[in-house]
Amino acid sequence: MAQSSNSTHEPLEVLKEETVNRHRAIVSVMEELEAVDWYDQRVDASTDPELTAILAHNRDEEKEHAAMTLEWLRRNDAKWAEHLRTYLFTEGPITAIEAADTAGEGSGGDAAKGATAQGDGSLGIGSLKGEAALARPPRL
């Protein structure tokens, strides 16, 4: 996989800066996920409890790195953002969400049986504006 970070399919001179940066991010995610897989295997194979704990900790750090880079991709690529909003943090069959989304039934496909997603990027908590004012004691 190291070769992926040193090579592009097209000459660098013809690529936009944002394309090169996305390439860096994508390769980083690939490397982080590969490291997660390696650490998973080492955790399974280790017979020493302390080493197992260290390896599991290291694996989880790699997951954090992958998540951070995915967030960068979401913030810097509208199509990534659209797809991540459709599929992440939903319930129900993923393929049903995809079918509902491609049928034009909205982001996350609430029409998909059991699916829940907020197409507006919200966590579904709702607004707390005005509620703080109600909870405050009157000024004297």
Curated annotation (Swiss-Prot):
Q: What is its main location?
A: other
Effect caused by changing residue 62 to A: Forms decamers in the absence of Fe(2+), binds 1 Ca(2+) via E-34, loss of ferroxidase activity
Q: What is the effect of changing residue 34 to A?
A: Altered oligomeric state in solution (decamers and dimers), no metal ligand at this site. Increased ferroxidase activity, alone and encapsulated
Region: Disordered, residue numbers:
100-140
Q: Does the keyword Chloroplast apply?
A: no
Q: Which reaction does it catalyse?
A: 4 Fe(2+) + O2 + 4 H(+) = 4 Fe(3+) + 2 H2O
How its function is modulated: the record gives:
Ferroxidase activity inhibited by Zn(2+). Mutants at Glu-31, Glu-34 and Trp-38 are also inhibited by Zn(2+).
Region Targeting peptide, as annotated, extends over 100-140
What's the protein here called?
A: Encapsulated ferritin-like protein
Instruction: Please give the organism.
Output: Rhodospirillum rubrum (strain ATCC 11170 / ATH 1.1.1 / DSM 467 / LMG 4362 / NCIMB 8255 / S1)
Q: Which gene encodes it?
A: fer
